[in-house]
Amino acid sequence: MSNKVKSDIEIASKAEILPVTTIAEHLGLDADALELYGKYKAKLSYDTIHSLKDKETGKLVLVTAINPTPAGEGKSTVTVGLGDALSKKDKKTVIALREPSLGPTMGIKGGATGGGYAQVIPMEDINLHFTGDFHAITAANNALSAFIDNHMQQGNDLDIDGRRIVWKRVVDLNDRALRKVVVGLGGPIQGVPREDGFDITVASEIMAIICLASDLKDLKKRLSEIVIGYNYKKEPITVGEMGYEGALTLLLKDALKPNLVQTLEHTPAIVHGGPFANIAHGCNSVSATSTALRLGEYVVTEAGFGADLGAEKFLDIKVPALGKAPDCVVIVATIRALKMHGGALKTELSEENVDALAKGFTNLQKHTESIQTFGIPYVVAINKFITDSDAEVAKLEALCEEHGIPFSLTEVWEKGGDGGLELADKVIAAVESGEADYKRIYDDAWSIEEKLEAIVTKVYGGIGVELSSKAQKQIVEFKKYGWDRYPICMAKTQYSLSDDPTLLGRPTDFVIHIREFIPKLGAGFVVALTGDVMTMPGLPKKPAALNMDVDENGNAQGLF
């Protein structure tokens, strides 16, 4: 390979891309199994998905990470590279990823399809509008908002209290100006004035429902169970009571179908759904993972941000819906993130600092312990960056060996699948060891307080939770309605094990502050909002969009 560092879009645009029908053939599927979106993208038809239901499932590998820097630590890159490496080991492999959100793409990340020589393609299409799933979810979400406001305008038979509507509008962008808005202004014919707000699309309950629904029937049932707000007696009102679950299902019927694409090395990739892991459950769809498990011998998937967020939610929320636990977990660690956790300034992460690396190692240790709590074998993937010094690499390897942590130095960004062959060997060994003995860290029958304590003490390393007066009142209300039986989905900063983004490394003796709960009954969980986490992000001072353009031939520039 050339010594010149090429951008992701340069690498992707020069790659040989096979027709998606050829990729399907690798999986034993013919063209009739696909609904084509051009030559290189397709949805898997419902008939195809149903025909696979009785097939034996393959082995499942979950990729997670330590607490990241703002730029991310390469989870998607390692997921893709490991998938390609397993393919090189003659394992029939399928990768299952989330779809990127336009908000972070235009904001800070510039894209989310892997990186370097470990990418899914067509990269430009996937990072932008892809097959329209997010637009369908946005439309369905906002249609429900329109139905709610229209119901209030047209007599309000359900006595919806406009002050207690919890359903928000969404847009798939980072737009802080829309966090709080007032709708219905302009006089009697314009609607009923009320406070409203926007979340980013990936935080929508409908996104979570798409990712947890098993089929159309389940989708419709889940949509009917969405709580949109409360009446004047403070009783919950659902979509089913309003009667719009059928219309919403109609809008989402194609968005529920998984999307098939490929990696640079032509490993099949099913890319579907995209909830964030800090404000939602952070996993791709059950439909995508389940289908992949019936098409491949090995399936490599990922869960957002660190093991305290995406992996915990995968293991406590997605696994029960999927009916299959991981056979191995890969924890991605980078030297730059460990240096940050050891006290190095974010502006100095490219500079050698072995002492900071050693201090930050405790963050990695905590995540390995958390995964062991779930009873699953793991391997640490040291995702090598070109800024890592030999001394830093040697120090991290020595620390892993000293503490008995299985690891592999991984160079898939630079070398593609060839850079992950050792990691593939260690993953195969872990899977074939049969050591996986999955166990959730709490039971659904536990109280909300007990579930919170389990997550905070066993996964975060804290000492307990502190509930606001609002959260305490909500728990009493939730018990009355039986909502305390649902799993907990923590909305928390991704940068720290605590709810304070400045508390790095492996903090101890901290409590998690729960400010309020949001019942998401259609998704099947209760969201616990901690700290200052927001469900509508803002843009940075210099968004990645400043460097994006298109040439005279319509080719994208500036995606990375």
From Swiss-Prot:
The keyword ATP-binding applies. PROSITE patterns: FTHFS_1, FTHFS_2. GO terms for biological process: tetrahydrofolate interconversion. It is an enzyme of class 6 (ligase). Disulfide bonds: none annotated. ATP binds at T69, P70, A71, G72, E73, G74, K75, S76. Pathway: One-carbon metabolism; tetrahydrofolate interconversion. It catalyses: (6S)-5,6,7,8-tetrahydrofolate + formate + ATP = (6R)-10-formyltetrahydrofolate + ADP + phosphate. The keyword ATP-binding applies. Keywords: ATP-binding, Ligase, Nucleotide-binding, One-carbon metabolism. Its EC number is 6.3.4.3. One of its GO terms (molecular function) is ATP binding. InterPro entries: Formate_THF_ligase, Formate_THF_ligase_CS, P-loop_NTPase. Signal peptide: none annotated. HAMAP family: FTHFS. Belongs to the formate--tetrahydrofolate ligase family. This is Formate--tetrahydrofolate ligase. The lineage of its organism: Bacteria, Bacillati, Bacillota, Bacilli, Bacillales.
